[in-house]
């Protein structure tokens, strides 16, 4: 678990510091290569989500969990700043007409959105086990990052709900946007 958290942080640092410098050259080349570079972070966070479901995994790596809480906090800030720029549905023609630079930008936003939503689950799993965690972990979550306070605007904004181009409500579930015809089904 600690190795995955370390890999996640290294990937985030690469994405934040190196990717902006190489994205234009990546756009000129093979698009699958650039997508896989961006998707690595999503793969690692997915593995961590599965592991964090289990109390033993959280308890085993309490020192690294502090770094994971900081990571999730940064993703929550990104999600709050997203506003109306959340991933939109595109027609096939729109996707074909995109330049490589626009395609990379769209993929980047979609992947980052998915990662941020997964971070909500991870924080929930950590929160469920607060009584079993040491004081520095609880302090990081409740005092330093003030996770409960940052979740309130996210719950009010509901970035996991969008209206598609047809005016229908969609909810982000299971790593994809799903149409919800019944208003009762929308959280």
Name the predicted role of every residue range:
Residues 1-186:
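Long, leucine/valine-rich, helix-dominated scaffolding and oligomerization segments
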